């Protein structure tokens, strides 16, 4: 799993390794989910992320977490 936050773009993303995105689904206009051809979750993107969670102490972040 890879988690990134871009403070300037106000975008938070979570990507699951081994799952290739085939389609992006607009959930709320600011939240998008990416799925593969079989409907498995490939990633989640949150725009305007600081309006949805307290991210004031975060700067640009990139974290990889093995599953």
Task: Map each language-model feature to its residues.
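Structured beta-strand/loop patches that form or line metal/cofactor-binding pockets in enzymes
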Residues: 2-7, 12-26
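A general secondary-structure signal for short beta-strands and their flanking turns/coil
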Residues: 9, 28, 58-60
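Amphipathic, hydrophobic secondary-structure cores in small proteins
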Residues: 17-38, 44
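C-terminal structural segments of small proteins and small subunits
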Residues: 38-67
